[in-house]
Regions:
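Solvent-exposed loop/turn segments at secondary-structure junctions
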Residues: 2, 28-30, 101-103, 131-132
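N-terminal cationic-hydrophobic initiation segments that often serve targeting/anchoring roles
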Residues: 11, 114-115
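Accessory cap/linker subdomain of secreted extracellular hydrolases
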Residues: 9-89
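Active-site phosphate/pyrophosphate- and oxyanion-stabilizing loops and adjacent acidic/basic residues
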Residues: 8, 111-112
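Glycine-rich nucleophile elbow surrounding the catalytic serine of serine-hydrolase chemistry
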Residues: 1-9
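Alpha/beta-hydrolase-fold serine-hydrolase catalytic core, especially in secreted/extracellular enzymes
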Residues: 16-19, 72-79, 83, 88-92, ...
């Protein structure tokens, strides 16, 4: 996921030598995807993650105390805006991967990255399996290689026929099927409002 996080940031700078990217399940908005979910402070993973960073680099003055920042900046202010990748600046061809299983950490970042990137050539793959199991699955490694071969080696392969969006519809544990779409959110999606009932 850290590789995806850094890709969102670096690619937003549009370095001329960068020809393609594959952000595989990574956040790009620290406030909404890690520190506060729906405005509610995350007191579990966020603290665990930040304390792990501090433990590794105790003498590094560039490491911010994000747990304290979470207390000092409970609203989405300039502090958090500066730590949000400017996704609209991304013009590089991309293959983004999200998972239904990483809700609240990586899937929002991947979906927003795909939607907001200005890239003309972009694809989204959404699976319902375990994060790293999916990343290293033979068929997904082949998908990544096909994408990179097309953009980095200029190979005339089948990548250009890949649907813009491929997503898994889960039926139960390790059972589901894939569908294709022209965009995300899925065109013709019907949203159903849900309301809390006090009873």
């Amino acid at each position: 996921s850290y590789l995806a996080v850094t890709q969102w940031w670096v690619t937003s700078l549009n370095p001329p030598h960068l020809k393609a990217m594959i952000p595989w399940e990574g956040l790009n908005d620290m406030y909404r995807e890690v520190a506060f979910h729906g405005g509610i402070p995350d007191t579990g993973f966020f603290r665990f993650w930040v304390q792990g960073i501090f433990a590794r680099w105790t003498d590094n003055p560039n490491i911010e105390d994000l747990v304290q920042a979470q207390k000092d900046h409970p609203l989405f202010d300039d502090y958090w805006k500066q730590r949000q990748a400017p996704l609209h600046q991304i013009k590089t061809p991309l293959l983004a991967c999200a998972s239904w299983s990483t809700q609240g950490l990586h899937n929002r970042g991947t979906f927003e990255g795909f939607k907001q990137a200005s890239s003309v050539n972009k694809w989204l793959y959404v699976h319902g399996r375990k994060e790293w199991e999916s990343y290293y699955a033979r068929e997904n490694l082949e998908k990544q290689k096909l994408f990179f071969d097309y953009y980095l080696k200029k190979e005339d392969n089948d990548w250009k026929d890949t649907p813009t969006v491929t997503y898994e519809v889960r039926e139960k544990f390790y059972q589901g099927h894939y569908r294709e779409a022209s965009d995300f959110p899925i065109p013709n999606t019907q949203y159903t409002p849900l309301y809390l009932d006090g009873e």
